[in-house]
């Protein structure tokens, strides 16, 4: 799958054929380091802050405490992700509203599709 243009118009239509296969691929390709133990494959971003990406958590990865200033939608594609609301398994859609905050872990590793209305603000290490 070609690397998408990182910035797109808010009115552009985008298609990502083979996205689930790409999420499960073990080759590094377009995956980049994001946080310790977490890689990111950016799908798109717009000048006003909307963005989406695949995130690949290695076993034991922790994403530091952060605040959501816009909606975040997270679809767990494989594995399990844990936040203060509980353990979220593959197939679960997690919606974090503006003003919510949390820390996320994945003891066994996982891959998620994350869609952000606005960038998150990291408040912890």
Say what each PLM segment does.
Residues 50-54, 74, 110-111:
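Structural motif
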Residues 1-49, 125:
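A short, N-terminal "cap"/entry segment at the start of jelly-roll beta-barrel domains
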Residues 35-68, 87, 97-101:
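Conserved short histidine dyad/triad with adjacent acidic residue
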Residues 39-42, 75, 103, 111:
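Residues located in well-ordered beta-strands
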Residues 82-106:
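Short acidic-glycine-tyrosine-enriched beta hairpin
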Residues 58-61, 68-83, 90:
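Glycine- and acidic-residue-biased ligand/ion/polar-headgroup-sensing regions
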Residues 62, 92-93, 111:
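Residue-level marker of beta-strand positions
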Residues 98-123:
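Ligand-binding loop in jelly-roll beta-barrel domains
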